[in-house]
Amino acid sequence: MDISKMNRYTAPVNFASLPLLTTFLCGVGLLLLATFTMIQVTSTKYNRNLLKELFIAATSSVFLGFGSVFLLLWVGIYV
């Protein structure tokens, strides 16, 4: 297996777009986290909706997770 004959790996995301992706994904994740927190603080035990809370929490966690990955790539920690 000759390494000089192998194709060079190119990243699926352009490095110039990492700051924008990080800012957008973390911003949306934090906005959803704030929404989830406000729902928890202002709702009573009679008007809570479990599916809505789970959906907002899961969506926030996905956005913050991908935002964190792109933040690590942006600062040079290649995961």
UniProtKB/Swiss-Prot annotation:
Location in or out of the cell: Membrane
Key word Cell membrane present: no
GO CC terms in record: cytoplasm; endoplasmic reticulum membrane; membrane; oligosaccharyltransferase complex
Membrane topology of the entry: Multi-pass membrane protein
Classification via InterPro entries: TMEM258/Ost5 (IPR007915)
Pfam families tied to this protein: Ost5 (PF05251)
The entry's keywords: Membrane, Transmembrane, Transmembrane helix
Transmembrane segments: 19-39, 55-75
Annotated GO biological process: protein glycosylation; response to endoplasmic reticulum stress
Cleaved signal peptide residues: none
Pathway the protein contributes to: Protein modification; protein glycosylation
Keyword DNA damage: no
Gene Ontology MF annotations: oligosaccharyltransferase complex binding
Record's function text: Subunit of the oligosaccharyl transferase (OST) complex that catalyzes the initial transfer of a defined glycan (Glc(3)Man(9)GlcNAc(2) in eukaryotes) from the lipid carrier dolichol-pyrophosphate to an asparagine residue within an Asn-X-Ser/Thr consensus motif in nascent polypeptide chains, the first step in protein N-glycosylation. N-glycosylation occurs cotranslationally and the complex associates with the Sec61 complex at the channel-forming translocon complex that mediates protein translocation across the endoplasmic reticulum (ER). All subunits are required for a maximal enzyme activity.
PANTHER family: TRANSMEMBRANE PROTEIN 258
Quaternary assembly: Component of the oligosaccharyltransferase (OST) complex.
Family, as annotated: Belongs to the OST5 family.
Protein name: Dolichyl-diphosphooligosaccharide--protein glycosyltransferase subunit TMEM258
Gene: tmem-258
